[in-house]
């Protein structure tokens, strides 16, 4: 008798239906990497029927919605969540839409199943019968073949489909405009081809393409031999210097070409291959075409462009002085180079558009001395407050802080929070040793603040420079050393900078040598991104370093470091030379002045009255209110007050003959973050991705964001480009939305096509106040367009405001 092989005993159907059990994340629907083997694939897919259907119909448009021709606010309403039936080629809106035409199509009575559909934006395959997502790797080849065909067809037919959709919009628009006596405007929006999981890049670039101030300023520097006039500070008593700039760097040139090409909307979707390849040379982490984080991409891009521009300005200043060296330059030349360089590096277009400033104010409760730290930011990361029921605190813990909060309630207005009291136990338990050491380091930095210090922003010690940068730094160092004492050197060498790379993440190629830090980090927030390494940043984290009163040293700080950070790597045109630099080699982007004249009553004053939140409110204003609320530094977070320590030491010396050194005096303190310089373009980042213990999760709660945002309640009274009592208004013009889960999602953009603000453009390009800027432009409302890679759709304003925003782009209008 023949015995069967036990490995072949199971029927083939049972083998296919078996799939691994993987725990689901609470916010993720795509944790199963291997996918599902579906038994309906054989009967629910017809390649010939699909090819015939898509040739006869519009691409990525719900045919039923198109038949209904529904208009809202004069615009054709068409959803971007389109699913295609792989049996007959029917295209319908998804189950999350109002009409649910795709689901209705499946439920219609038929002899053959129409249960397998594919999303034409994210390319997710779904089976209604199995109620599961399918994978092309675990099913028959026909599934992979039809997906490949549809993706190729999408890149070819996107332009014609959009033009036919726009004709329907224009027909309706022309009818309405004839009745109103107006004209219909052409939309200056162009789709961007997806190179392979590059939706995170496309969404950001759509918003930058609608940043009109960026294109205006780039037009000034696009050509070689461009003249730049540098005005030194009045203290230097030097005449303005006109320098001739060389050609822009390769990434800057690629960015200019890309933004210029985005205006040519009649040519169809644009391939960003040239710009993306240039960025990958600077940041190799993007080479693998994996899903990345849009905020991180934005930081890398602006950081790299700014580095090229500052090097360009630096080289032009050295050329104006016949390229001096440390041996040939005299003291007078060094002083001039520093004076012109200090103002010259600030004239790059990235700083003029995107950079703002945060001021952290710390006040000792005992001696009432105040210290400030000024920190530049490229965006502000705002935590999203979730609706969770908090556990009741023990009476002992309640009473511990009640007296202080009650006694100080009448003295200081505004929301007061106690730092590091309600941290989840899970987060404490699973935090890495590096996170703990970083937290200890940050606390020590905060405690080292005192009233007698001026503190400024310090950056990475390992800086990459080319030949001109090294020569520039050498000139600065040789001059600074003449005025530095050995004590100053020892203090500066004791300063350490922060690394944003988590211990669990693996740095890529050239990034492993020097990790990311630099100016263009978020002003707060966990930089946790989906499908990428984790970059946890604590709220309001600042870097501190002591600054002496030497004017030469301050100038050296302003010019020495023209290489922002080591994130920009892989550039073969520059020498890779990383040196540990002391404080005189670090860039002081904005002049940080210690506020000695502040009284305790005025230390935390804002431009206007504090914003009043409502119950259960979740909006940009409430997030900003939470971000700028006052904190109490107490318990383990007490401030090491050097002024109190100094007074105690003095008292001991007067009352005792012993010369024993007094231990540091720790006191309760108040701390608050406020905006002290507002940028022309404000970028807000909503922290939707979090690490809870060992798991990752996404916060899907909707955050309300206004079309017009008043930033005055969150600005300090000493805000550099605003006055007390004035409004600081910003208009919304761009949104980056993330849909999906932590492990698999899709980035899209909402952009507002509008008339450029003439007053704002003149104000930003000329760097001076323009008469009439006090009054907001009386502009037209503009038109919102939803862009998903190459797919474009005109949407009503209400649709844009209902988006699950991840990044928000605001431009200043008042």
Swiss-Prot record:
Catalyzes the deubiquitination of SPDL1. Plays a role in the repair of UV-induced DNA damage via deubiquitination of ERCC1, promoting its recruitment to DNA damage sites. May be involved in the maintenance of photoreceptor function. May play a role in normal retinal development. Plays a role in cell migration. It is linked to Leber congenital amaurosis 19: A form of Leber congenital amaurosis, a severe dystrophy of the retina, typically becoming evident in the first years of life. Visual function is usually poor and often accompanied by nystagmus, sluggish or near-absent pupillary responses, photophobia, high hyperopia and keratoconus. LCA19 is an autosomal recessive form characterized by reduced vision in early childhood and severely reduced responses of both rods and cones. Residues 1-62 are annotated as: Interaction with ERCC1. The active site is at 199 (nucleophile), 746 (proton acceptor). Zn(2+) 3 binds at residues 85, 88, 105, 114. This is Ubiquitin carboxyl-terminal hydrolase 45. Zn(2+) 1 binds at residues 38, 40, 127, 130. It comes from Homo sapiens. Zn(2+) 2 binds at residues 62, 65, 93, 101. GO terms for biological process: cell migration; DNA repair; global genome nucleotide-excision repair; neural retina development; photoreceptor cell maintenance; protein deubiquitination; proteolysis. Keywords: Cytoplasm, Disease variant, Hydrolase, Leber congenital amaurosis, Metal-binding, Nucleus, Phosphoprotein, Protease, Thiol protease, Ubl conjugation pathway, Zinc, Zinc-finger. Residues 190-813 form the USP domain. It is found in: Photoreceptor inner segment; Cytoplasm; Nucleus. A zinc finger (UBP-type) spans 36-153. The lineage of its organism: Eukaryota, Metazoa, Chordata, Craniata, Vertebrata. Widely expressed. High expression is detected in the cerebellum. In the eye, it is expressed at high levels in the optic nerve, sclera and retina, with relatively low levels in the choroid, lens and retinal pigment epithelium. The modification Phosphoserine is found at residues 28-29, 508, 526. Residues 515-527 have a biased composition (Polar residues). GO terms for cellular component: cytoplasm; cytosol; nucleoplasm; nucleus; photoreceptor inner segment. InterPro entries: Papain-like_cys_pep_sf, Peptidase_C19_UCH, Ub_carboxyl-term_hydrolase, USP_CS, USP_dom, Znf_RING/FYVE/PHD, Znf_UBP. Belongs to the peptidase C19 family. Changing residue 27 to A: Significant reduction in interaction with ERCC1. It catalyses: Thiol-dependent hydrolysis of ester, thioester, amide, peptide and isopeptide bonds formed by the C-terminal Gly of ubiquitin (a 76-residue protein attached to proteins as an intracellular targeting signal). Changing residue 25 to A: Significant reduction in interaction with ERCC1. Complete loss of ability to interact with and deubiquitinate ERCC1. Its EC number is 3.4.19.12.
């Amino acid at each position: 008798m023949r015995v069967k092989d036990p490995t072949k005993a199971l029927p083939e159907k049972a083998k296919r239906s078996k799939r691994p059990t993987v725990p689901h994340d609470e916010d993720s629907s795509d944790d199963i990497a291997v996918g599902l083997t579906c038994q309906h694939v054989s009967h629910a897919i017809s390649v010939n029927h699909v090819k015939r259907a898509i040739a006869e119909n519009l691409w990525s448009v719900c045919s039923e919605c198109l038949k209904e021709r529904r208009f809202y606010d004069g615009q054709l309403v068409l959803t971007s969540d389109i699913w295609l039936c792989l049996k007959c080629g029917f295209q319908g809106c998804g189950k999350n839409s109002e009409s649910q035409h795709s689901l209705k199509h499946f439920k219609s009575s038929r002899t053959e199943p129409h249960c397998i559909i594919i999303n034409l934006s994210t390319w997710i395959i779904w089976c209604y019968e199995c109620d599961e997502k399918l994978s092309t790797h675990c099913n028959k080849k026909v599934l992979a073949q039809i997906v490949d065909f549809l993706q190729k067809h999408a890149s070819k037919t996107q332009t014609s489909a959009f033009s036919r959709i726009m004709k329907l919009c224009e027909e309706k628009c022309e009818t309405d405009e004839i009745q109103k006596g107006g004209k219909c405007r052409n939309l200056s929006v162009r789709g961007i081809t997806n190179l392979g999981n590059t939706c995170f890049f496309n969404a950001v670039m759509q918003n930058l393409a609608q940043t009109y101030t960026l294109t205006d300023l780039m037009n000034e520097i696009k050509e070689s031999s461009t003249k730049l006039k540098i005005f030194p500070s009045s203290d230097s008593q030097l005449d303005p210097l006109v320098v001739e700039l060389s050609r822009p760097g390769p990434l800057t040139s690629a960015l200019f070409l890309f933004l210029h090409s985005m205006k040519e909307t009649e040519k169809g979707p644009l391939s960003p291959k040239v710009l993306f390849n240039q960025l990958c040379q600077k940041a190799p982490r993007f080479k693998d075409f994996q899903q990345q984080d849009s905020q991180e991409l934005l930081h890398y891009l602006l950081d790299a462009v700014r580095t090229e521009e500052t090097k360009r300005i630096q080289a032009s200043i050295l050329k104006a002085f016949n390229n001096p060296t440390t041996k040939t330059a005299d003291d007078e030349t060094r002083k001039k180079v520093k004076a012109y360089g200090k103002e010259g590096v600030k004239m790059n277009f990235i700083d003029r558009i995107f950079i703002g400033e945060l001021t952290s104010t710390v006040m000792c409760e005992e001696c009432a001395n105040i210290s400030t730290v000024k920190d530049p930011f490229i965006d502000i990361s705002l935590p999203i407050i979730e609706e969770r029921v908090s556990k009741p605190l023990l009476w002992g813990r309640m009473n511990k802080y009640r007296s202080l909060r009650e006694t100080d309630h009448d003295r200081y207005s505004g929301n007061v929070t106690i730092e590091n009291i309600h941290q989840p136990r899970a987060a404490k338990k699973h935090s890495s040793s590096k996170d703990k050491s970083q937290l200890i380091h940050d606390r020590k930095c905060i405690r080292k603040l005192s009233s007698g210090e001026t503190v400024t922003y310090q950056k990475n010690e390992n800086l990459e420079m080319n030949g001109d940068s090294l020569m520039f730094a050498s000139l600065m160092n040789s001059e600074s050393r003449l005025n530095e004492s050995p004590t100053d050197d020892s203090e500066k060498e004791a300063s350490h900078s922060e690394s944003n790379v988590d211990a669990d993440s693996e740095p890529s190629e050239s990034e492993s040598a020097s990790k990311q830090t630099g100016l263009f980090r978020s002003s707060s927030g966990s930089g946790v991104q989906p499908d990428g390494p984790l970059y946890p940043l604590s709220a309001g984290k600042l870097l501190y370093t002591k600054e002496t009163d030497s004017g030469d040293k301050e100038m050296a700080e302003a010019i020495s470091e023209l290489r922002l950070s080591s994130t920009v790597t892989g550039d073969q045109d520059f020498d890779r030379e990383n040196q540990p630099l002391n404080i005189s080699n670090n860039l002081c982007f904005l002049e940080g002045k210690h506020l000695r004249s502040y009284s305790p009553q005025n230390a935390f004053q804002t431009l206007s009255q504090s914003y009043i939140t409502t119950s259960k409110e979740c909006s940009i204003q409430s997030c900003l209110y939470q971000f700028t609320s006052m904190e109490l530094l107490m318990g383990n977070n007490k401030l090491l007050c050097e002024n109190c320590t100094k007074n105690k030491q003095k008292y001991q010396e007067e009352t005792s003959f012993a010369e024993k050194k007094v231990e540091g005096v720790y006191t309760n303190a108040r701390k608050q973050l406020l905006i002290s310089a507002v940028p022309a373009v404000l970028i807000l980042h909503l922290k939707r991705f979090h690490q809870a213990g060992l798991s990752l999760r996404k916060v899907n709660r909707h955050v309300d964001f206004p079309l017009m945002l008043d930033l005055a309640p969150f600005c300090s009274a000493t805000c550099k480009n605003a006055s007390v009592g004035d409004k600081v208004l910003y208009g919304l013009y761009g949104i980056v939305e993330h849909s999906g889960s932590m492990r698999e999602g899709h980035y899209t953009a909402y952009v507002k096509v509008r008339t450029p603000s003439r007053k704002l453009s003149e104000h930003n390009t000329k760097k001076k106040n323009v008469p009439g800027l006090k009054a907001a432009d009386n502009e037209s409302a503009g038109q919102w367009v939803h862009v998903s890679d190459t797919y474009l759709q005109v949407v009503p304003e209400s649709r844009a405001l209902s988006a699950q925003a991840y990044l928000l782009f605001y431009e200043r209008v008042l």
